[in-house]
Amino acid sequence: MVHVVLPKSQMDKAGELPGKFADTAIPAIVQRMVEMGASTSRLKAAIAGGAQLFQFGVSSSLDVGARNSEAVIAALRELGIPLQAKDVGGSVGRTLRLVSDTGLVAVRTIGGTERELAVLGKILSSSGVAA
């Protein structure tokens, strides 16, 4: 699971914070999963978030949430990882929950109720490696 803060890593000149940016976090977590034995052909993704929590008028360039969502989708596409489900945009934050033994991904908007977003399949085998 990744929680990105910004879409592009260009501000991270030293490359010290790859998990903070969509364009580096997605490849980094996929690389780590492969190192642990996962097969990229079996990976699937579900994403949630990308809300515009702060209003800045009509400037879409300041809509970091939308830019994050677009960057995550682009990174997944570039890596060939299918996007199974998404719940993005709007103006309300979300909480995401992953049940690792079933692959259930649930999302809850702030002040709302939890709902199933996707079932990605069994995530962990008994050895802890992606099944």
Language-model features and meaning:
Residues 1-36:
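Conserved mixed alpha/beta catalytic, RNA-binding, or beta-rich assembly cores of soluble enzyme
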Residues 41-49:
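Short glycine-rich phosphate-binding loop at a beta-alpha junction
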Residues 43-44, 56, 81-82:
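Surface-exposed interaction patches
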Residues 52-65:
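Phosphate/ribose-phosphate-bearing ligand recognition and processing surfaces
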Residues 65-131:
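Divalent-metal-activated hydrolytic enzyme cores
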